[in-house]
Amino acid sequence: MSLPSRQMAIVNPPPPEYINAKKTGRLTNQLQFLQRVVLKALWKHSFSWPFQQPVDAAKLKLPDYYTIIETPMDLSTIKKRLENRYYEKASECVGDFNTMFSNCYLYNKPGDDIVVMAQALEKLFMQKLSQMPQEEQIVGGKERMKKDIQQKTAVSSAKEQTPSKSAENVFKRQEIPAGFPDVCLSPLNMAQEAPPTCDSQTVVQITKGVKRRADTTTPTTSSAKASSESPPPLREAKPANAPVKENTVKSVLPDSQQQHRVLKTVKVTEQLKHCSEILKEMLAKKHLPYAWPFYNPVDVDALGLHNYYDIVKNPMDLGTIKGKMDKQEYKDACEFAADVRLMFMNCYKYNPPDHEVVTMARMLQDVFEMHFAKIPDEPVESMRACHLTTNSAKALSRESSSEASSGDCSSEDSEDERVQRLAKLQEQLNAVHQQLQVLSQVPLRKLKKKNEKSKRAPKRKKVNRDENPKKKAKQMKQKEKAKSNQPKKKKPLLKLEEEDNAKPMNYDEKRQLSLDINKLPGDKLGRIVHIIQSREPSLRNSNPDEIEIDFETLKASTLRELEKYVLACLRKRSLKPHAKKVVRSKEELHSEKKLELERRLLDVNNQLNCRKRQTKRPAKVAVSPRPPLPPPPPPPPELASGSRLSDSSSSSSSSGSGSSSSSSSSSGSGSSSSDSSSSDSSDSEPEISPKFTGVKQNDLPSKENTKQIQCSVPDITSAETALVQQSTGPCGAPGKPPQQMPGCQVPHHLQATESTASVQTQPLAGDCKRVLHGPPVVHASAESHTVLELQCHAPVQKDIKIKNADSWKSLGKPVKASSVLKSSDELFNQFRKAAIEKEVKARTQEQIRKHLEHSAKDPKVSQESQREFGSGFTPESSSNKVQGRSHGEEQSEQQQLPSPSETQDISKLWLLKDRNLAREKEQERRRREAMAGTIDMTLQSDIMTMFENNFD
C-alpha cells in the first residue's frame, strides 16, 4: 500500500460528546470556578493553542494516535461540557483536564516541545485549582431555600393573625404604653418615624414595637407584613380609654416634635451637603483606579464568592449609599459615615490583609476620612440644646404615658409645664443662633483682609524668606483663635467656592502649561510637586521623585495655581535670551579673528617667498662638504620664533600682543614663550633671566598666555614653513645677514643660525609644507607649545649678561592692541579658563618628566641645545666679544657633529614624535567638536549668571 493511500486511510473519529443525555448535570460553585477562572486562564496562555481543538490525526499525519489514545480530550470539549452542564460534580471536570495532559505525555516523548508546553499548562492548572472553594454547593439551592422559608413564615404569620388572637393583642397594647419608651431604641426616631396624623398609624407603630419585643425569632419582614395585615381587626376592637391617650399625644407632641424637626433639618442639610460632596469626590474619575470595586454591590455569582453572605452580614457599596443619599434617607452625617465605614469593614473582614482590594480600600478610606474630618461640627450650645430637646421628648413621652393612666386634671397641669419648658428652650435656641451669627461674621472679615493682602503683595512673601517662620507662627495663632471661635463652617465653604470659581483649562492651555513646566530648571520642579500634592489628596502619599501627573485628573484650581507659579518663574528668566545673544556675538568675533589671522599668515608667507627669490645668489656654501648637523631637540620652536621675529613687523596688529609680551617680560620667562604670544615687540626684548630651570617653566602659561597661545598656532605653522623654505636656498658667508623686511631688526645669532640651518632643517621641510597646505590647526592648545618651550629652556644653566639692557627694554615695549579685541579675549578667557587649566597642568607635568628622562639619556643633545640657546639670544648691537664667542661656539659644535646615520635616526625619531603629537591634537579636536553638539542648557544658564555677576 502506497504512502498516499495510507494518508487517505487516516480518518478522525467524532469529537467527544458534550451534551448529557441523562440530564443529570448540575451547576455547582466549584464547576463555576473551573469555568470562569481555571479554563479562562488556561485558554489565554500562550502554550494552549495545541490543546484548544481535538487532535487532527489526518492533517498531522498521525495514523496511530487514536489507537494509542483511547479517550481523547481537549480544552474546547471541556468548555462545551461546562457550558451545557454536562458534569454532575467538579471532580469529573478535573478528571477531563488530567486526561488531556496524560494523553500528551503518553503519545509524545519526554523532551518534545509539546510536552514542555503541557507541563507549563499543568502547572498553571494546579495553581488555579488550589484557589477553588473546598466545599461544593449547588448554586441555585440557596435561592430556593430562601423562597421556601419566606413562604412558610408568611403562612405562619397569617395563621397567627386570626380574629380571636387579634383581640388579645389589642388588650396587650392597652396595657403596655406606660413602659413603651423603655422598649423603643430612641424616642427621637420614633417621634420622627411616626407623626400623629391618624389613629391607625400610631397604633400600627406601637404594634411594631410590641412585636419586636415579644417575638425575637421571626424576622422583621414578617412582623411588618403582619402589622400591615392587622389594621382592620384593630380598628374594630378599640377600647374606651384609647381616644383619651391619643388626644393627649396629639395635644403634647406636635409642638415639640415640630420644633425638633425644624432644628434637625437645618443642621442636617448643612452637613449632608458636605456628605454629598464627599460622595461625589469618591465617585470622581481621579479615584477610579482604586475605587471601582466599591461602585456596585458584590456580584457573588460572577466572582464565585459563595460564602460572602455568611461572613458579611450587612453588605454595602457606594451605589447603595448614593441611592440612599438621593432619597434623603440619611438623617445626619453620622449615618452616612457609618455606611461608608461599614463598606470598608466588610472588605477588610472578607479579604486577607495582603489582598489588592484591601490596599485599594485603604486608599479610598484615606480620601473619605480626610474630607469627612473637614466637615464643620455642630456648636456645643446647639448640641446641648439638642440633648435637652431629646431629653424633653423622652420626658414628654413618659409623662404622656403616665397621663394616659391618670385623669384629665393632671394632663392639663403637665401641658402647662411643657409649654413653659418649650418656651425656655426656644429662647435658648434663639440666643445660640445669634451667637453663631456673630462668631461666623468675625472670621469672614479676617479672611477677606488676608485675601486682599495676599493679592496686593504676593512678591514680598517670596523675597522675605526669613520672615516665614514669624508669619507661620502668626498663622498658627490665628488658626487656634479661629478654632476657638467656631469658624469651621466657613473655611471649607470658601475653599469649595474657590475650586468652583476656578476657570477650567482647555486643551491648548494645558499643553502650553506642560511645555512651560518642561522649560523650568530642576530646582523649581520640587515646588510644582509640592503644589500638586498639597491640592490633590490622591497624590499626597506618592513618591515626589517618581510622581506621574495627568492633567486630565487635576482640579481646575490646581492647574491655575501651577500656571501662576510657572509664569512667575519664567518672568524671572526673561533676561536669559539677551545673555545668549551676547555669547553668540562673541563667538562670531572669535571666528572672524581666526579668519583674519589665517589671511594675514598667508600674506606673510607670500611676502617671504618673494623676498627669498630676490635674495637668491649663486654663491657656494662653505659648509656643504661637511656632514649634516643633527637636529637638536628644540629646532621647531627656535625656527618658528626666528621666523616670527622677522615677520612680526608686518603683522603688528595681531590679537593680544601687548598684554602677553609685557606679562612675559615682567615675569622673566624665556623668549620662546613670549614669542608664542607676541607680535612685533618680541624681536628686540632682552628676556633672558639669570637662571633657567624646568620647574620655573611650569608657571609660564598665565591667563593671557594660555589664550593667546591658542590663537597664534596658525602663525607658528606658517612661520616655520616660511623659514624652512628660506633656509633651503643658497646662503652667503656666515657673517652676512640675509635681506630683511623693512623695519625689522634680526639679531646676529639668528643670521648665523639661518646660514647653518639649511642642512639641519632639510628633513622637516616637507612635513611643514604639508602642515601649511592642510587645514590650519586652529584648536591646538597651549600644552604643545609649552612642552616645546620646556625642551628648549630646561638644559640651559649658565648666566648671560647683556649690555644696554635698559635700552633694549625701552625698544621692546609692547604695542597696545585695540580695546575691542582685548576685551573680547579676556571674556573668552574667562569661559575657557576653568576647562583648560587642569588639562594644561597635567600634560605639562607629564612632558617635563619625559623631557628630564630624555635629557638624562642623551647628554650630547642637551649640551648642543644648551650651547645653541646660549649663543642665540645675543642682539646685533651687542659687543664684538659676544659675537666672537657665538662664532667660536658654532665652530666647536660643527667639530663635534655625529655621523650622518645617527642624524637620520634622530630626525626620524623627532618626525615620529611630531606626527604622534599632531595625531593626538587632531583626535582631541574631533572629540571637542563632537561634544560641542550636546549643550547642557542648565549648565550654560548657570555659567552665564556667574559671568554676568563677575562682569558687573
Curated annotation (Swiss-Prot):
GO-annotated cellular components: chromatin; nucleus
Carrying Phosphoserine, the residues are S186
Location of the motif Nuclear localization signal:
208-219
Concerning SUPFAM superfamilies, the annotation shows:
Bromodomain
> Which GO molecular-function terms appear in the entry?
histone binding; histone reader activity; lysine-acetylated histone binding
The positions annotated as site (Histone H4K5ac binding) read: N108, D113
The UniProt record lists the keyword Nucleus: yes
Q: Subunit info?
A: Interacts with the acetylated N-terminus of histone H1, H2, H3 and H4. Interacts with P-TEFb components CDK9 and CCNT1/cyclin-T1. Interacts with mRNA splicing machinery proteins SRSF2, DDX5, HNRNPK and TARDBP. Interacts with SMARCE1.
Q: Which family does it belong to?
A: Belongs to the BET family.
Domain description from the entry? Bromo domains mediate interaction with histones that have acetylated lysine residues at specific positions. Bromo domain 1 mediates binding with histone H4 acetylated at 'Lys-5' and 'Lys-8' (H4K5ac and H4K8ac, respectively). The bromo domains also recognize and bind a subset of butyrylated histones: able to bind histone H4 butyrylated at 'Lys-8' (H4K8ac), while it is not able to bind H4 butyrylated at 'Lys-5' (H4K5ac).
Quote the protein name from its UniProt record: Bromodomain testis-specific protein
